Amino acid sequence: MADSNLNEPVIIQATRLDTSILPRNIFSQSYLLYVIAQGTDVGNVANKANEAGQGAYDAQVKNDEQDVELADHDARIAANTKAINILEVRLTTAEGKIVVLRSDVDYLLDEVIDIQAHLVTVDQRLDGVESDVSDIKSDYVSKTVTESQSLASPLDVKTSYSVDGIQVVGARQTGWTAATGTPLLGSFNANQSYTVGTTYTQSEVAALATGLEQARQRILALETALRLHGLID
């Protein structure tokens, strides 16, 4: 704080010093001039002292102002230092989070690569399924379609064939002994009647024999057909 005493001027009580106030006929002329010069010097010294005091006071005032400004600067520097420290903490935290995020991103990239590889496999499997579905659509036997359907391959069933719930073809019947002879595949009159008198004639017996032979041959033809279809053996 500035010293206010420095701002108070030095007051010289004896402001006038000349030969009129000195004793006469005592001092030599040179001494009188010396004394008068001393008075002038004292005034000059007082003026310089006052100027120096004023300068010192002004300097102290300026120093006080600078001290206030420096204190403000110190406060601002302290605040800035605190803010910088907070920013450094936040920056360190952010750097840590960035490291974590980079790790998470790397993990997610690996997951995406795995998913993409899995998608390629799924696409391949889907292509296979679509191809199979296309094949099934173009070549299948429906349970509900009423139009005629056909198979290019043999059909094997476990027990029997049925039509409207009624069995029409069953399992093969075994134990049949194959007949011999010539089967009758041509036409014959199933309503053929035979005339037989009270006494058998040769022609009547021959006609009956022929009819019996035709019947046996037709039976053989039917047996052969059943064998060829695998119904008997």
From Swiss-Prot:
Localisation per UniProt entry: Virion
UniProt KW keywords: Calcium, Coiled coil, Late protein, Metal-binding, Pore-mediated penetration of viral genome into host cell, Repeat, Viral genome ejection through host cell envelope, Viral penetration into host cytoplasm, Viral short tail ejection system, Viral tail protein, Virion, Virus entry into host cell
Residues covered by region (Interaction with tail hub protein): 2-50
Origin superkingdom: Viruses
Motif mapping: Basic cluster: 216-220
Chain's role: Cell-perforating component and plug protein of the phage tail machine. Together with gp4 and gp10, gp26 is required for stabilization of the condensed DNA within the capsid by plugging the hole through which the DNA enters. Host cell membrane perforation allows viral DNA ejection. The needle penetrates the host outer membrane. The needle is released and the internal head protein gp7 is ejected to form an extra-cellular channel.
Domain notes: the N-terminus forms the domain that binds to the tail hub protein and plugs the portal vertex channel, the middle coiled-coil rod, and finally a C-terminus distal tip that is a tight trimer of alpha-helical hairpins.
Protein name: Tail needle protein gp26
Lineage of the species this protein comes from: Viruses, Duplodnaviria, Heunggongvirae, Uroviricota, Caudoviricetes
Gene: 26
